[in-house]
Swiss-Prot record:
It catalyses: cytidine(34) in tRNA(Ile2) + agmatine + ATP + H2O = 2-agmatinylcytidine(34) in tRNA(Ile2) + AMP + 2 phosphate + 2 H(+). ATP-dependent agmatine transferase that catalyzes the formation of 2-agmatinylcytidine (agm2C) at the wobble position (C34) of tRNA(Ile2), converting the codon specificity from AUG to AUA. GO terms for cellular component: cytoplasm. Keywords: ATP-binding, Cytoplasm, Ligase, Nucleotide-binding, tRNA processing. Its EC number is 6.3.4.22. It is found in: Cytoplasm. One of its GO terms (molecular function) is ligase activity, forming carbon-nitrogen bonds. This is tRNA(Ile2) 2-agmatinylcytidine synthetase TiaS. Its main location: cytoplasm. The gene is tiaS. It is an enzyme of class 6 (ligase). The keyword 4Fe-4S does not apply. GO terms for biological process: tRNA wobble cytosine modification.
Length: 429
């Protein structure tokens, strides 16, 4: 943190945003992209790319992708922070229109100048809230308690709060506490003009494959070659034309020249994200899993039963038991588990859902283990080689947080300030 030439100590206004998605076209990232652009043309500097933070994919009331967002805005004075929060953000939120369940929160951090300052100075309750919100079900009261903690913290100040009684508050605060130090990725999202939102997307499939082949492994989940299916475009009525994900922002900009679309986009924005990091998964003993957890459990196959619809239920036991569902959409993952004999030791990661009087773990991946890996309640931290085989579903079955096996490891990845433009120069409506 440094003193500016005018003698003012710089500050950061952190804005957390959630629940601007609606069944008909509303989108939290779209609102955030417009807000980022609006702040830029008013002369405000963003201290980082906008954050796109995916939270617990198992919760029952999520909107598309269960994503919240955050912006870090450099300001010089508290009254300037209030203008950003109350005049720019609040007015834009009202003009954008939504279901009335949207939330945003603006927190001012004193003596903060850049991204690293923010990571160091942000209230600890935000970090803890994120860690819980990405793994498990978080009560609204937990978010309210975090707000009270921020109000009493002399290093920060709550500048604005909208939607404090809605569950979007959990996402808005959790986004501000996201752990993007351990691992992070980027997504370039290209948006559509409003008149096109109800029209089918026309994106040349060959150009998606070309982009994938030219940019891998720095980009990922562009195309499912097993099912001959593009993965970059949503299917509903919303403002997103397509999004490409990767390790570094500069590689994503190539999509603007390579991917061929039959419409003029409105604008684009690059987000820093926790996508494709497996941030949601947490190792647990079977007896400790709860509804809407995202858990990794270890156990022995007790029983395997195909059920109507092409799905398979595996009874997995280690002191206690849990049903593990391998749905038809998991393809070869389901096919392989059918061949495993009773007594096979496996590790399964996925989402815990309540079904009548018991819990079911919806499988995202399967690891076949050596019997020596089993210990009381779980598996050894270091898993032996040999039969240590990991199986995944087709890429089309991956959700936002699932880490594809082709993603390279980046143990030294650091939080660097923006190295490319954050968004397009204009928005064309």
């Amino acid at each position: 943190m440094s003193i500016q030439e005018d003698g003012l100590e710089p500050m950061l206004l952190a804005i957390g945003i959630d629940s601007f998605d609606t069944p008909l076209a509303g989108c939290t990232t779209h609102f955030t992209s417009i807000l980022a652009y609006t702040l830029s043309i008013h002369g405000y500097r963003l201290a980082d790319y906008p954050w796109l933070v995916r939270l617990n994919p198992a919760v029952p009331w999520k909107t598309r992708g269960n994503g919240a967002t955050a912006l870090l805005v450099s300001v010089d004075r508290e009254d300037e922070a209030r203008r950003v929060a109350e005049e720019v953000t609040s007015r834009l939120a009202k003009a954008y229109g939504s279901t009335g369940k949207e939330s945003f929160v603006a927190i001012l951090l004193y003596h903060a100048d850049n991204l690293q300052d923010y990571i160091t100075a942000r209230p600890h309750c935000l970090v803890e809230l994120y860690r819980r919100a990405v793994h498990e079900l978080v009560p609204l009261k937990t978010a309210m308690n975090c707000l009270e903690s921020i109000r009493e913290d002399g290093k920060t100040k709550l500048i604005a709060l909208h939607g404090s009684t809605h569950r979007g508050l959990v996402g808005a605060l959790a986004a501000l506490g996201a752990d993007l130090i351990t691992d992070h990725t980027f997504e370039l999202i290209v948006y559509r003009k409003p008149r096109m939102w109800s029209e089918p997307r026309r994106i040349d499939e060959d150009s998606i494959i070309e982009f994938d082949l030219k940019t891998r492994p720095l980009t990922f989940l562009n195309y499912d070659y097993e099912q001959s299916k593009p993965l970059i475009a949503p299917h509903g009525f919303d403002p997103v034309l397509y999004g490409v994900r990767g390790e570094e922002p500069h590689i994503l900009l190539k999509a603007l020249k390579i991917i061929d679309v039959e419409e003029e986009p409105s604008h684009w924005t690059i987000f820093r994200t926790n996508q494709a990091t497996n941030a949601h998964l947490q190792r647990k003993e079977i007896e400790r899993v709860r509804p809407y957890d995202n858990a990794i459990v270890c156990g022995v196959i007790e029983d395997t039963k195909p059920i109507p619809g092409g799905h398979v239920i595996v009874r997995l036991c280690n002191n206690t038991c849990i049903d593990t569902a391998f749905y038809r959409e998991t393809g070869r993952l389901r096919n392989h588990v059918l061949k495993l004999p009773r007594g096979t030791l496996v590790e399964v990661g996925g989402q815990v859902k309540p079904h009548t009087d018991k819990l079911t773990l919806n499988a995202e991946y399967l690891r076949i283990l050596e019997p020596a890996s089993l210990r009381a309640g779980g598996c050894t931290a270091t898993i032996p080689s040999g039969r240590n085989v990991i199986l995944y579903p087709p890429r089309a079955a991956f959700h936002h947080l699932m880490k594809p096996p082709e993603r390279p490891l980046h143990p030294s990845k650091s939080l660097e300030p923006p190295s490319t433009p954050i968004h397009s120069d204009t928005i064309s409506l």
